[in-house]
Curated annotation (Swiss-Prot):
Gene: glgA1
Residues given in the record as ADP-alpha-D-glucose binding sites: 15
Cellular component GO terms, alphabetical: cytosol
HAMAP family linked to this entry: Glycogen_synth
Top enzyme category: transferase
Organism this protein belongs to: Methylococcus capsulatus (strain ATCC 33009 / NCIMB 11132 / Bath)
Protein name: Glycogen synthase 1
Pfam families (alphabetical): Glyco_transf_5 (PF08323), Glycos_transf_1 (PF00534)
Protein family: Belongs to the glycosyltransferase 1 family. Bacterial/plant glycogen synthase subfamily.
Length: 493
């Protein structure tokens, strides 16, 4: 099968979140299954620097001269095309946000360009001599590809993956006009969303198959609580909507071979995990007390991640035998709260604002407990890393967290099936109670070791998930023009 994978970020070329991890791992896993997968992404300066000596191919699109840089995804044999349009993508830093933290004012134009080039690529109008059977689109940045493809008589099948429904690519009507999109697309059944242009609706309406990155999230987004105003549309496409759990890069995230760890370890050498805890503590000047558990947290400091719940219980945590290590960035007020707490109690709380890949690995290995109290979580990766590293996650029962962590109930503990602590209401008191539960288990070394080993035994590799995506692609191919789309893709203006 020939698959074009389109994403606005791909690890290790550009990363702001889990989308990049998926885009850097899934194509390689599909290739390993024997499929011809090729990636298209913007040529950000960082991506060009990280790419392996790309070849430049000149092309024209809508009267503009553009360049397609042809290379390979680093560390793989997967072909990678970088869309080199300096006026749109030649900016260092966050690919979506300007230095002042506001979205780039031309984001609609930038990602409409990516969509148009993707469509031309699928129709072999760029002279590459290759046409995909399936186009796999990811999040709002690729949302215009499905509706633009609907005008093509020999289009490929389209799969649209929702990594986070909260980010929708909303722009005023004037942007719709400026992009010169077909007038027929300006209606409620297409791209119009309460008077605005919605990129994500393009994927949700026109794709042959839609999926989210966990089964629970696929169910949740059909409800008003999690549907972000699109739950009615998603319910109407329920027969074409499914959830496939993300995998993880089990080579990069392997405690037995992790180059970032001072003491690699496995299920049979779990005691070496304590060496990593000691090194983590030394990095921050935290006392090395075996009776004190280290709580770790890595991620964006935003309300979605439940960071405010943790901030609300900081005073209570300080009454417990724990230390807290936090790595992340986001909401400036949340950042300041953690910085103030660390300054006031440096022997108990350590914070690094920003992102540091080696440190993220060390926290996963050195922490005893990992905190992930998300308000919503399409899939989540850190709870998967934590279990692989024998670090017990505390998670909220939502989205991919609910699908991947087995709560340490008495029944599951007795059956050897418990891998973490799960709580439900998004309230500080319930997070604190979950910490109490974790510490009670921590005080029973044999029980604790069993929970750690249960998580380490799970298979979260991309091999399993990639096979499910192949099945989804086949469904999309079979379902083309079979009445699955709620909008007739060839309706008149």
């Amino acid at each position: 099968m020939k698959i074009l994978f389109v994403s606005s970020e791909v690890f290790p070329l550009m990363k702001t979140g889990g989308l990049a991890d998926v885009s850097g791992s899934l194509p390689a896993a599909l290739s390993a299954l024997g499929h011809d997968v090729r990636i298209l992404m913007p040529a950000y300066p960082e991506a060009i620097s990280a790419a392996e000596t790309p070849n430049a191919l000149s092309l024209r699109q809508a009267g503009s001269q553009l360049t397609l840089l042809s290379t390979r995804l680093p560390g793989t044999t997967v072909p990678l095309w970088l869309l080199d349009a300096p006026a749109s993508f030649g900016r260092f830093g966050n690919p979506y946000l300007a230095p002042n933290g506001a979205p780039w004012p031309d984001n609609a134009e930038r990602f409409a360009l990516l969509a148009r080039v993707a469509v031309d690529l699928t129709q072999d109008r760029l002279g590459l001599g290759w046409k995909p059977d399936v186009v796999h689109c990811n999040d709002w940045q690729t949302g215009l590809i499905p509706p633009l493809l609907s005008d093509e008589p020999n289009r490929p099948a389209v799969v649209f993956t929702v990594h986070n429904l909260a980010y929708q690519g909303l722009f005023p009507y004037e942007t719709f006009q400026r992009l010169a999109l077909p007038p027929r697309l300006w209606k409620m059944e297409a791209l119009e969303f309460y008077g605005q242009l919605s990129f994500i609706k393009g994927g949700l309406v026109f794709a042959d198959r839609i999926n989210t990155v966990s089964p629970s999230y696929a169910e949740e987004i059909q409800t008003p609580e999690f549907g972000c105003g699109l739950d009615g549309l998603l319910r109407s496409r329920k027969s074409c909507l499914s959830g496939i759990l993300n995998g993880i890069d089990d080579v990069a995230w392997n405690p037995a071979t992790d180059p970032y760890l001072p003491a690699p370890y496995g299920p049979d050498t779990l005691e070496r995990k304590k060496v990593n805890r000691t090194v983590l503590r030394q990095r921050y000047g935290l006392p090395d007390d075996p009776e004190v558990a280290v709580l770790g947290m890595v991620g964006r400091m935003v309300e979605q991640k439940g960071v405010d719940l943790l901030i609300d219980i900081l005073d209570d945590l300080l009454q417990l035998p724990v230390q807290l290590v936090v790595l992340g960035s986001g909401d400036k007020e949340f950042e300041r709260c953690f910085e103030r707490a660390a300054a006031a109690r440096p022997e108990r709380i350590a914070v690094t604002i920003g992102y540091d890949e080696p440190l993220a690995h060390l926290i996963e290995a050195g922490a005893d407990i990992f905190l992930m109290p998300s308000r919503f979580e399409p899939c989540g990766l850190n709870q998967l890393y934590s279990q692989r590293y024998g670090t017990v996650p505390i998670v909220r029962k939502v989205g991919g967290l609910a699908d991947t962590v087995e709560d340490a109930t008495p029944e599951r503990l007795a059956a050897g099936q418990a891998s973490g602590i799960v709580f439900e209401p998004a309230k500080p008191a319930f997070l604190l109670e979950a910490v109490y539960r974790a510490l009670a288990l921590y005080r029973e070394p044999e029980v604790w070791r069993a929970v750690c080993k249960c998580g380490m035994a799970k298979d979260f590799s991309w091999r399993k998930s990639a096979s499910r995506y192949v099945g989804l692609y086949r469904e999309a191919l079979a379902g083309m023009n079979a009445g699955c789309s709620i909008a007739d893709p060839r309706c008149a203006a």
